[in-house]
A protein has these predicted regions:
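Post-signal peptide N-terminal segment of mature Sec-exported envelope proteins
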Residues: 17-37
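Bacterial Sec signal peptide processing site at the extreme N-terminus
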Residues: 2-24
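Surface-exposed short loop/turn segments
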Residues: 39, 49, 53-124, 132
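N-terminal secretory signal peptides
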Residues: 31-51
Length: 145
């Protein structure tokens, strides 16, 4: 019977305690989505044990027609958000790049107000999903350093 203690694996924390501090955040593209991502990633923490990062993000939003009905009217749109993220770990002077994509479906409406409200709700959900994925990716990168 063998017991493997101290095998070298670390438990990845998926909690609210962040191990990084964003010093500089640059964004290009859709300002609403980028603002939501920035708000979720940038926190004012003055802990000395945090790793300082510069984050640059380029967000592209595509709205494609997904379905049409018999009378050739649009019934569904597909919203695709793609974010290209560049992270610079200031202490190590290492740069990492990755791309995160998320998509959602929007039902067309005759009322423009309802369509805009539904579109903004879906984009907010997609931005929150992307910021959570970016956060997990940053945490994974910093755990590997």
């Amino acid at each position: 019977l063998f017991s493997l203690n101290h095998c070298g694996f670390k438990v990845v924390k998926d909690g609210d305690d962040k191990n990084y501090n964003v010093i500089n955040f640059e964004d290009i593209g859709n300002s609403n989505i980028n603002y939501t991502i920035q708000r979720n990633l940038v926190r004012s923490q003055n802990n000395q044990n945090l790793v300082d990062l510069n984050i640059s993000i380029e967000t592209i939003l595509n709205k494609n027609i997904k379905e049409k009905n018999i009378s050739n009217r649009v019934t569904k749109y597909e919203l695709i958000v793609m974010s290209k993220v560049k992270i610079l770990v200031i202490d190590k002077n290492k740069e990492y790049e990755f791309t995160i994509t998320d998509k959602g479906e929007l039902k067309a409406s005759n009322k423009i107000n309802k369509l805009k409200y539904d579109e903004n709700s879906i984009l907010l959900r997609l931005a929150n999903n992307i910021s959570n994925q970016i956060d997990r990716k940053i945490t994974s990168i910093l755990n590997d350093i």
